Design a protein with these regions (language model features):
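Catalytic domains that recognize anionic headgroups
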Residues: 3-9, 21-23, 35-134, 140-555
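Alpha-helical transmembrane segments and their cytosolic membrane-interface
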Residues: 14-36
């Protein structure tokens, strides 16, 4: 078999006799133009861009960005590693550009953190022919040109002077152009803050650097203990120990819960429980973040959302406090990890179960967490179980973009479904059907959890809250993970519900009318820590009764 095609990987395009600046300029042009197509598209769609002066300003911004990219290339691409680094920049830029264009996301430190924690199943859900074509056109073509290109030979000191000269000249020209367009550019960046997260590859380089700095700082700090003074209600030998199940939803947005007013019947089980008088739905709840990486640790933290920045030193979680108070704690994981929250308590990952009914191709539907639950609880300390048990179930929920995978065939209510991960290619109704089926399955799952709790003799209760919401194409945005200050309400408005058994109602001495009055009040993930402590009757200096949703209603 002939291997002549390998010649394409050998040097073949001569730049001999031409100025070496042209080499880096070609790469800079590819990065600033092809690699920033979503940025230019977003700029062109702005209402301010509606006259000749505005279009001239866009040309000035493009020229300034290209020059800035040229400076950047000459700073990082040196002869010793020129070829691989150039291709790496193309891969990084075009991959980010694809996801920005396809899902309307932006690249910031939390988005990079999410990407770094993506498991193999999530990667498979993101692969598509469109991504392959993007990489072939955006990386393969310019990458081959770059790999085969050989700059003219020059002495070592000439290489330094050529590249440093390019940095100086490019910086001067960039500064001059920025002065010309500064007024327009500053106004655009101020009024449309997402733009600053859309400039490739600077957004990715900044995000990776910021994330590395944060993680390094956290590694150097020991885990901070909290709640060492925690204690629970004294054990009554005559009373059965309570069981609390905390279900942490995934990517469920309040806008698609019919119990909250959505027009499609996505939550019939919850509504039936509500009609029976045992379930309370809190309709005005805000998430702590717009992605799991932020929201789950924040949800179980004693710190509020504003304090849970990437500069916060790591602390123990709500589960540690419950354990210190003497409760038995079990975490069941059907997602991509507990983000450190469950590291010091008993936990089971469903990926090892391989249940024949509930698990397919390495992923499991949420009902798998109920299979063998009693047996798993029995493995916990009997002494702790005599005081009370908390079980946390971390759902697969509505994790996208493959929403159609989140509900088993027999639970699909709305058809036809979008079965593509290239969400913009689906019609709105099919996409909505796939997502609503995932919500309907969550409703079914929560109904099954309540059914299991009803079989228990002791006081039982269920708390449910989603980690964050989801965008389904509103304003061209899909999925989640937008910076919090600019995130649409679909990503931050989440469902929360409480189901209480008759025995737990007596145990808490709960005031039904009082609890119903809490349903329409504004709450957030900040209330979760204190509400769960209150539900477990745990006393600690960390507990703030005014933050406990149910405190005024328990006597």
């Amino acid at each position: 078999m002939s291997l002549n095609w390998l010649n394409w990987l050998r040097p073949g395009v001569s730049m001999q006799g031409r100025h070496p600046w042209l080499v880096s300029a070609g790469l800079a042009l590819a990065l600033s133009t092809l690699g920033n197509a979503p940025f230019w598209w977003a700029l062109a769609q702005l209402p301010e861009v509606n006259n000749l002066r505005a279009y001239a300003g866009l040309i000035g911004i493009w020229a300034a960005l290209t020059l800035l990219m040229w400076v950047f290339v000459n700073l990082v691409v040196w002869p010793w590693w020129r070829k691989p680094v150039g291709v790496l920049l193309l891969v990084m830029t075009m991959t980010a550009s694809y996801f920005m264009a396809m899902y309307g996301v932006v690249i910031d430190p939390t988005m990079v953190a999410n990407a770094m924690q993506t498991n193999s199943a999530e990667v498979r859900d993101l692969l598509s022919l469109t991504l392959l074509l993007t990489l072939v056109i955006g990386v393969g073509v310019p990458g081959l040109w770059w790999w085969r290109l050989e700059p003219g030979a020059c002495l070592g000191w000439q290489r330094w002077t050529h590249q440093l000269g390019a940095v100086v000249v490019g910086s001067a020209l960039t500064a001059a152009l920025l002065l010309l367009v500064f007024q327009d550019l500053a106004s655009l960046m101020r009024n449309h803050t997402t733009l600053r997260f859309m400039i490739n590859p600077f957004n990715t380089v900044y995000a990776v650097g910021r994330l590395a700095k944060t993680e390094q700082a956290q590694r150097q700090q020991p885990l901070q203990a909290i709640g060492d003074d925690a204690s629970a209600r004294p054990i009554d030998a005559k009373a059965a120990a309570p069981v609390l199940i905390l279900v942490v939803g995934e990517t469920a947005r309040a806008a698609n819960f019919s119990i909250g007013g959505y027009e499609r019947p996505t939550t019939p089980k919850l509504q039936a429980l509500q009609a029976q008088g045992d379930l309370y739905y809190f309709s005005q709840v805000q998430s702590c973040g717009t992605n799991t990486q932020v929201s789950v640790p924040c949800l179980f933290s004693h710190l509020d959302r504003k304090a849970n920045t990437d500069n916060t030193v790591g602390y123990e979680s709500l589960l540690d406090v419950l354990q210190k108070a003497g409760w038995a704690v079990l975490w069941l994981e059907n997602q991509s990890g507990c983000k450190g929250v469950c590291d010091r308590v008993a936990h089971v990952d469903t990926s090892i179960i391989k249940h024949p009914q509930f698990c397919v191709a390495g992923e499991c539907w949420d009902e798998v967490m109920l299979d063998g639950l009693s047996e798993r609880m029995a493995t916990l300390s009997a002494e702790r179980r005599a005081r009370g048990t908390v079980v946390v179930m971390h759902q697969m929920g509505s994790h996208g973009p493959a929403y159609y995978k989140r509900s088993p065939p027999e639970r699909k209510v709305f058809l036809p479904e979008c079965t593509s991960n290239a969400l913009p290619s689906c019609n709105t109704q099919a996409l909505r059907n796939a997502y609503d089926n995932s919500i309907a399955y969550t409703d079914h799952f929560l109904g099954q959890v309540v059914s299991w709790l009803k079989t228990q003799q002791q006081p039982t209760a269920l708390w449910y809250v989603s980690d964050h919401g989801e965008s389904l194409g509103e304003n061209g945005i899909y999925l989640h993970g937008m910076p919090y200050k600019m995130a649409p309400k679909e990503q931050t408005h989440v469902p929360m519900a409480l189901w209480v058994s008759p025995a737990m109602r007596r145990h808490w001495a709960v005031d039904d009318a009082c609890l119903r009055a809490q349903q329409s009040k504004p709450w957030s993930h900040d209330n979760w820590f204190h509400t769960v402590l209150g539900s477990a009757d745990v006393k600690t200096g960390l507990y703030q009764p005014e933050m406990d949703i149910t405190r005024a209603c328990r006597h």
